[in-house]
Amino acid sequence: LDPKLVAQRMMGWTDARTMPTAERLQALLAPEDAAAPASGQPYPFFLASPMSGEVHELGSITEWQAEWKWDGMRAQIVRRSAGISIWSRGEERMNDAFPEIVDAAESLPNGTVLDGELLASLPNNLLPFSMLSRRASRKRVGKKILAEIPSVFVAYDLLEAHGKDIRSEPL
């Protein structure tokens, strides 16, 4: 059994609302072909790390890729037959805190997983991380919070398309 598959299945495993059962353990350890990605499980998050070598060791600048460092919360949007889930890198499901993102994700094709950043944003103005954090900590988001601290999702990677894991494919 591929350890990466077990790691993916373990995302959200510690959900306090779900009791451990023999069935959940069997699903965790099931052969790869027996567990199609129909659930809302995200992929393990890969975080950036500081460069350990010298800049000249990176090769030609024409081969480089860079991403903007947003002041938001890393998240994955999972759109599969089981529905839509927004996951934090801390393995928390955040659907209740970001209902407008869930609504927008309805337009994604089934079998899509996006990696990106949740941001608090007014038109033409990103809001501070502290406001996003305040919103994310709420179990229920009312109209006032939706108006004061609207959110957007900036996707920077497509991890799954049409139900196929494409993380190992070239950009």
Q: Residues of each region from the PLM?
A:
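N-terminal nucleic-acid-engaging modules of covalent nucleotidyltransferase systems
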Residues: 1-171
